[in-house]
Structures are given as C-alpha cells and as structure tokens.
Amino acid sequence: ALSMLKDMPVAYNLNLIVLDREGRCALVETLDGRMAVKAIDSDSGEQALYATNHPVLEELIPYEPKAFVHSIRRYDNITAFLERHKKGITAGQLKDFFLTPYPEGLSCSYYSQFFGTTKTMVLDPVRGSLSLCWGGRPENGWHDFNFSDPFPQETAAIEIHNQTADPSIFAYRSLV
C-alpha cells in the first residue's frame, strides 16, 4: 500500500493511516504535493500513530505551521487518552472515547459550521473486522462488519444533533 501511495498524485491535504494484519502501520500525510510517512511495526518502541486535521510529521509542519484550535485539542485528547491507557486499551474504551463529545473527546456536532462527525470506526486488522457508528452518537449504535463477508448495501435512519461551536475553536494556533 505504501509503495502505491508514494506514486499516487494527491492534489489535496490529507492524513491517512494504513495498516495490515502483520502489525505494520503507517501515517501518511500529504500537504500541497508533498508527502511524509512514519511507519511502525509490532517491534517498534512507539505503538500508536494518530492524526487529526493538521500535519503532525516534522517534515511537513514548516509548510503548514498553524492549525485550528479544535484539531490541536483533539490531537492532545488522543495523546492524553493513550497516556492514561499505557497498559492496553479495549475496544469498548476506544469506542467510548471516540464518541465522547468535544472538547473532552473527539465527536463533534457542528454540522451547520461544516464540522461534524459523520462516522466513527474502530478497525481490527488482525481479526479483519470493523465497528462503525454513524453520526458520532452512541444512540445510533455500533454496527459490526467482517472483511471476509460481503458488506450489506443498506441505508439507515440515524440521529444527529446540530450544535453551534464556540467560534474560538476555529482560530489558528501555531504548531511551532
């Protein structure tokens, strides 16, 4: 996957995490035609890669040295969550954290301001499964899928609640 990504022309900025069933994982960031990659495996000292909506790899930060306050806060929330759970994280703990509303967690409901959680996924590459929750709300339930089974073609009614964000979360803050 990494070799294919390195040759792929990407015309927008993204943070992408790719992983496989052998315990290899990479954070791939693109920014204005540039690409940076950080890879880990089961033998690496670092055992987690994560990103929000700003560059986190040192090679790209000079090209985008500021980020929205909400992106930095969510990144810091992930860092703190991982620090609190050094001995291991269950899927249930991860799901609860993902659905915790911002600013304490990651879930955002500011849809009219173009900033809302549309879906939350927990993937298990070893088992070949994923759990999905629409709208970042526990009321919508988690739906489990196995990669070896056909994905159902279906629609579902979900509940979302639009809120208005404090404008300060859209301010830019320096990353350096």
Please report, for each region that a protein language model flagged, where it lies by residue:
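C-terminal, well-structured catalytic/ligand-binding subdomain of enzymes
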Residues: 2-176
